[in-house]
UniProtKB/Swiss-Prot annotation:
Entry-linked Pfam families: Pur_DNA_glyco
A single GO molecular function term of this UniProt record: alkylbase DNA N-glycosylase activity
Gene3D superfamilies in alphabetical order: Methylpurine-DNA glycosylase (MPG) (3.10.300.10)
Keywords: DNA damage, DNA repair, Hydrolase
UniProt KW Glycosyltransferase keyword: no
UniProt similarity note: Belongs to the DNA glycosylase MPG family.
EC number annotated for this UniProt entry: 3.2.2.-
Source organism (scientific name): Cytophaga hutchinsonii (strain ATCC 33406 / DSM 1761 / CIP 103989 / NBRC 15051 / NCIMB 9469 / D465)
GO biological process: base-excision repair
Keyword Electron transport: no
Enzyme class, broadest EC rank: hydrolase
Protein name (record): Putative 3-methyladenine DNA glycosylase
Length: 198
């Protein structure tokens, strides 16, 4: 067994640093008796209340965004375009709405299960490259919203996988975010093929 990331990992203030440090960590799910895992290869940081790209911009509080205001170390899953379940990690202390979108993972364990869930015949990067794809492959849905990452359903492990170089660039699909659309708060492992098109 590899250690899960501790609560203190998520409770730190610097969401950009945490986003970078999640690269190379392993996102694991045990759902419906099926175990899957993938190396996190791509993340995006969201730093509300000032971040105009965040669902919690300007301390917006709705039924959907309330999860942001919990203490870090839980999952935030929302539906995009009514189709894709997107998995985020809530960070920082209570009432500070920071979150990190997990955009891509490299399949590691339970690949056959991932391919079955994604209805794939051939293994290629479309299996888990992209936030909707990775959630489907790992079995993550809205049912896992607010799930504690200390539990045994969805969690993140440190397996001491080295990450030599990280690329920082702009986030995807946030043209509405004015000056925040140009923040280099998307991170990915340089040279890794399991990255979304972005």
């Amino acid at each position: 067994m590899f250690p899960k990331l501790s609560e203190s990992f998520y409770l730190r203030e610097n969401v950009q640093l945490i986003s970078k440090e999640l690269l190379g960590k392993v996102l694991v799910t045990y759902i419906d008796g099926k175990y899957t895992a993938g190396i996190i290869t791509e993340t995006e940081a969201y730093q509300a209340p000032e971040d105009k790209a965040s669902h919690a911009f300007n301390n917006r509080r709705t039924t959907r965004t309330e999860v942001f205001y919990n203490k870090g170390g839980i999952g935030y899953v929302y539906l995009c375009y009514g189709i894709h379940h997107l998995f985020n990690v809530v960070t920082n202390n209570e009432n500070i709405p920071h979150a990190i979108l997990i955009r891509s993972v490299e399949p590691l364990e339970g690949v056959d299960i991932m391919m079955q869930r994604r209805n794939k015949k051939k293994l290629d990067k479309t299996l888990t490259a992209g936030p909707g794809a990775l959630s489907q492959a790992l079995g993550i849905t809205r049912l896992h919203n607010k799930i504690p990452l200390s539990a045994n359903t969805v969690w993140i492990e440190d397996r001491n996988i080295p990450v030599e170089s990280i690329v920082s660039t702009t986030r995807v699909g946030i043209d509405y975010a004015q000056e925040y659309k140009d923040k280099p708060w998307r991170y990915y492992i340089a040279g890794n093929k399991w990255i979304s098109r972005g």
